């Protein structure tokens, strides 16, 4: 069967470029990473010393619980992004079911998004180890992630990825209906244990879903933080997250409107013929 022509969205992402401070992603490191992230991280209570736990107030215990939730959910997010890459994106290219250009439009900047989340996860992991699993200060880590040049870069990458989400889902659905080999590949990939019974249509939206969680988690950490300077800096990082989320939402709306108009134009053209 002849492969259908690729109908891309009206706007294409810019070239990937590089993060202001991060190294270029090393793709060969990602596959072992998927194995590394297969098991959930150990809860902080099981790793902290009994003496350290006994000294914590009720409010500080709650703070540590939310920090642990941020860490554990970032771990889970890196894992699912790696599944998207290693179970779907790379094999689709290897099997020549999608070209590199098509993949760059369906999964724009996926490699760099994984690297950014992985670096954030590693910075949280280092805090846990340095503080014997009872984290004293998290404000610098989260401000470095969501504020300043790194925050701007994160916003740029996530805007590209999330704004193509609706179009990507539609393109994949269309390909599955028209191309038997493509459909068989997707079904086989979705059956792999790494997907944990999720379909590709469930995995693609995870970046947008993750962006909605950061402000809530950071506000909850700030609410349970006694030190006023630390509290203020965490609230600043939460505000940075809200700005990123609002910007991404606007980009998503713009692209969805373009996608709808493009679809209507194609339908009207086909009807006239």
Q: Where are the model-predicted features located?
A:
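An all-alpha helical bundle fold corresponding to the catalytic cores
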Residues: 1-272
């Amino acid at each position: 069967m002849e492969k259908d022509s690729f109908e891309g969205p009206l706007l294409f992402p810019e070239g990937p470029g590089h993060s202001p401070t991060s190294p270029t992603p090393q793709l060969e490191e990602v596959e072992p990473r998927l194995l590394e992230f297969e098991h959930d991280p150990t809860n902080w209570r099981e790793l902290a010393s009994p003496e350290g736990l006994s000294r914590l107030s009720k409010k500080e215990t709650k703070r540590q619980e939310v920090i642990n939730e941020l860490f554990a959910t970032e771990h889970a997010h890196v894992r699912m992004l790696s599944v998207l890459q290693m179970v779907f994106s790379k094999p689709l290219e290897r099997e020549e079911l999608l070209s590199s250009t098509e993949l760059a439009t369906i999964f724009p900047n996926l490699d760099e998004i994984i690297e950014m989340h992985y670096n954030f996860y590693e910075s949280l992991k280092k805090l846990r180890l340095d503080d014997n699993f009872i984290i004293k200060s998290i404000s610098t880590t989260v401000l470095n992630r969501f504020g300043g040049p790194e925050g701007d870069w994160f916003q740029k990458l996530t805007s590209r990825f999330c704004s193509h989400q609706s179009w990507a889902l539609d393109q994949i659905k269309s390909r599955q209906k028209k191309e038997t080999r493509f459909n068989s590949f997707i079904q086989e990939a979705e059956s792999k244990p790494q997907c944990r019974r999720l379909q590709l249509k469930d995995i693609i939206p995870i970046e947008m879903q993750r962006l909605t969680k950061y402000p809530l988690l950071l506000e909850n950490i700030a609410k349970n933080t006694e030190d006023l300077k630390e509290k203020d800096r965490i609230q600043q990082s939460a505000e940075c997250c809200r700005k990123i989320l609002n910007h991404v939402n606007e980009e998503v709306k713009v692209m969805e409107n373009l996608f709808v108009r493009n679809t209507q134009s194609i339908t009207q053209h086909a009807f006239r013929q």
